[in-house]
A protein has these predicted regions:
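P-loop NTPase catalytic phosphate-binding loop
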Residues: 34-240, 244, 257, 269, ...
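Phosphate-binding and hydrolysis-coupling loops of NTP-dependent motor/remodeling domains
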Residues: 1-51, 225-342, 349, 485-544
């Protein structure tokens, strides 16, 4: 019969059932067009293609989209190799094609098997966070809290209920933030598990009105706290080990998910089966990943606007070249401030004003630490502050030819008379003679005092009067020497009149300066210091 109907070109009788879902469906077929076309259109609804659904009871099959404005956050569960990472890839790529980086930003929390790494090149991606990135996770949590406070304040100021209304009234666009978490099961491995769960709970509860959305995947239902799961409206199940878990998640149904990658169940009016779309075309997983990387790279090349700021992380080792080229360091120099290092929170320059600068004392309780601070500061003054002339008291003859110095004093005979020469220079300047704007750099105070015979009385005069006549002292000392409180000693006088302090040691281990009690204060590495201040000190990363 089939051969006869085909030979006579007789059209087939309509079938009572639609064809079964294909195993490979591509999101680019379900939403036609390219990102250049989509980016030129504004005011698109926040919908993302997730797959193709089959509804036998209605004899219908159609593209399944998720509307984040209406349906909020998503939790997807599935066994190994069922397509959890693919789901997030599809969701992310479809949103990235439709919206510019000014409109949507992504935080990729890749707690699974590196399934989100191909998405990193997207210009929309603020950062990628792994489960062992403890510093990044801490800063992400703080950023989430800060962003929630900021967005709530904007809504209060304009007396509106959600971000969409705020944008209509103010004309100011703020990006929608998506936290894409693949592999929620691994969260228990993090020492910050409680803080993470609290942050996700806040997003799921309050994020919808603030334009902040959470998408999570997990291998088992039990790993997600009941309170968090209850606040997530859209739940999807891929094939799980036990079909009972699917019914627990989606609701009572006779449907069973086939054991095929990407085959899933979602509750619409009733539980329905759908096929998760693939993010790009490709004959196998490798080709799909290559296509994701290629398209993401094209988006990155095409986008010329601003991009989301990554979570700042202090590098393991900070070279001076990297430090000097840091934007905040360059900004500090233009504003006539002295950059001393990078803070550990925002990874930006911490600086002190050059106007009114008098003297700086740096202290460490280990010789290697003291020497590293010396080299760091010498590099700053000789390379970044050309208006100052550095005169180095090189008692140990360590720094020959290493820095662009105005003068290096290392000969014993010259050092022996240096205290008197400094006093004579001060007197001459007080009488009106002009001279260079000097940084008098003393890396080892104890040995300089021994070599020059510097007295406490001379220190008092130089420290109280010298800065008024462009004679500024940058002095390094071991803690054991500078803690000497003998009446009239140079160490005591320096402490009495010093302006700025850098400490290469735990605050709790010194008694020179006031300090908060902290029994758990960690020891510093040799490329870490405190810039002392009241009421709080700032921990800095310095070059090495």
């Amino acid at each position: 019969i089939q051969l006869l109907t085909e030979s006579q070109q007789i059209p087939p009788v309509p079938q009572p059932w639609l064809p079964p879902l294909k195993e490979r469906i591509y999101s680019t077929d379900l939403r036609k067009g390219n990102f250049k076309e989509f980016w030129s259109h504004t005011n698109r609804s926040l919908k993302a293609v997730i797959g193709y659904v089959d509804i036998p009871s209605q004899q219908a099959q159609y593209t399944l989209e998720h509307d984040f404005n209406e349906d909020g956050n998503i939790a997807l569960f599935g066994g190994p190799l069922t397509g959890k990472s693919t789901f997030i890839q599809t969701l992310t790529m479809d949103l990235a094609r439709q919206f510019t980086p000014n409109q949507v930003n992504f935080y990729l929390l890749d707690f699974g098997t590196n399934g989100l790494l191909p998405l990193r090149q997207l210009p929309h991606v603020a950062d990628t966070i792994m489960i062992d990135d403890q510093e990044k996770i801490t800063k992400l949590i703080n950023r989430i809290k800060g962003e929630i406070r900021y967005r709530k304040a904007l809504l209060r100021q304009h007396m509106v209920a959600n971000v969409n209304l705020y944008q209509e009234i103010s004309g100011h666009q703020i990006p929608k933030l998506f936290f894409m978490l693949d592999g929620y099961d691994a969260i228990k491995e993090s020492p910050l598990v409680m803080e993470l769960e609290d942050a996700f709970q806040i997003i799921s509860r309050e994020g919808l009105s603030l334009g902040m959305y959470l998408v999570i995947t997990a291998g088992r239902i039990g790993v997600v706290k009941a309170a968090l799961l209850a606040s997530i409206k859209t739940r999807i199940s891929l094939k799980l080990t036990d079909d009972i878990d699917t019914r627990t998640l989606i609701g009572r149904t006779q449907l069973i998910i086939e054991d095929k990658p990407g085959r899933a169940m979602i509750k619409l009016d009733e539980p329905e089966i759908f096929q998760v779309a693939l993010p790009t075309k490709g004959d196998d997983a490798f080709e799909v990943i290559e296509q994701i990387s290629s398209e993401a790279g094209m988006m990155s090349e095409q986008w010329e606007g601003s991009r989301p700021k990554p979570i700042p992380i202090v590098p393991e080792e900070l070279s001076f070249d990297t430090f000097a080229k840091t934007i905040s360091v360059q900004k500090a120099l233009k504003e006539n401030t002295l950059p001393l290092g990078l803070d550990f929170v925002n990874v930006e320059s911490v600086d002190i004003p050059m106007k009114g600068f008098k003297h700086l004392l740096y202290i460490a309780n280990e010789g290697e630490h003291l020497e590293n601070i010396t080299r760091h500061l010498l590099e700053i003054f000789t390379t970044l502050i050309p208006s100052k002339k550095v005169m180095l008291m090189d008692v140990d003859d360590e720094y020959d030819g290493q820095f662009n110095l105005f003068a290096r004093i290392s000969e014993t005979e010259t050092l022996e008379d240096m205290a008197n020469q400094l006093m004579l220079e001060l007197e001459d300047r007080k009488k009106g003679e002009t001279g260079h704007d000097f940084i008098i750099f003393i890396p080892n105070l104890e040995k300089f005092v021994q070599a020059s015979g510097l007295t406490g009385e001379q220190v008092s005069a130089l420290y109280q009067e010298g800065w008024k006549y462009n004679m500024h002292f940058v002095v390094g000392s071991s803690y054991s020497y500078i803690s000497n409180n003998a009446i009239g000693s140079p160490a005591r006088q320096i402490k009495a009149y010093n302006q700025h302090y850098l400490l290469g040691m735990r605050l709790t281990d010194q008694t020179i300066l006031e300090k908060p009690y902290n029994s758990k204060e960690p020891y510093l590495n040799k490329d870490e210091v405190y810039l002392y201040g009241r009421p709080s000190s700032v921990k800095l990363k310095i070059t090495i």
